[in-house]
Regions:
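Flexible, acidic/Gly-rich N-terminal and inter-domain linker regions that tether
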Residues: 1-131
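Solvent-exposed, flexible loop/coil residues
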Residues: 38-41, 75-78, 101-104, 139, ...
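Conserved Radical SAM active-site core
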Residues: 120, 125-136, 142-218
Length: 218
């Protein structure tokens, strides 16, 4: 695999041998994000931020369909308030710090730093007839499986719903970018899937130990 730069962060909350850790350590919570809520919750969230609730549908279209958080591209929002609205409703949750590529670029692992310095991983896998995303539900893991490096490292904290969703959105953005580059290089229309078709919770963490956030992301 080829790789870019990395800044590792140690995860130190590790269960005793033979024990599992189901309750995540107490840590600060990430900022609230549009993706933490269902549509009704997003409308309430926007209202609390001082904006009309109907803006939630517009922001949802930009984020989930257009995969953008760039306020300059959101021309259906008021120019005077769109930057402040986007910054408050869709704060940056993930910062990519490392990538690993295999299979000629068809498999890409991304390592992201969260707001508190914790690290999580996701993997984008492209096949002829599908695109699969492997995502994390926790930073670290408390299951303490002896065969798993993540489990042996310990559990830092649960991810929020939006932090889980953001991994998929980031993967979808990367897929879209890769397809554009391939089309420009070869001058042909894409022949492989254009969207993420499968999502598996097989990254870091045990999704059932972070049930509420995992279900919210689904």
């Amino acid at each position: 695999m080829s790789e870019s730069t990395a800044t590792p962060v140690e995860i130190t909350t590790r269960p005793e041998p033979g024990r599992i850790l189901l309750k995540a350590p107490r840590r600060g919570k990430p900022p609230k994000h549009l993706a933490d809520f269902d549509l009704a919750g997003r409308k309430e969230f926007l209202t609390e931020l001082g904006h009309p609730g109907f803006r939630a549908s517009q922001l949802s279209t930009h984020y989930f369909d257009h995969l953008t958080t760039d306020p300059q591209r959101m021309t259906d929002l008021p120019a005077a308030t769109r930057e402040e609205m986007v910054a408050a409703a869709m704060p940056q949750l993930l910062t990519e710090v490392r990538t690993l590529e295999a299979d000629g670029g068809d498999t890409i692992k991304s390592v992201y730093r969260l707001f508190d310095g914790a690290l999580v991983e996701s993997v984008l896998m492209r096949y002829e007839h599908r695109v699969t995303m492997c995502i994390s539900s926790q930073a670290g893991c408390g299951m303490n499986c002896p065969f798993c490096a993540t489990g042996q490292a310990g559990l830092t904290r649960n991810l929020s719903t939006a932090e889980i969703v953001e991994q998929v959105v980031a993967g979808a953005r990367r897929l879209k970018s890769m397809q554009g580059l391939e089309q420009a290089e070869h001058g042909t229309e894409a022949t492989r899937p254009l969207r993420v078709s499968n999502i598996v919770f097989m990254g870091m963490g045990e999704a059932l130990a972070n049930y509420k956030a995992a279900i919210g992301a689904i």
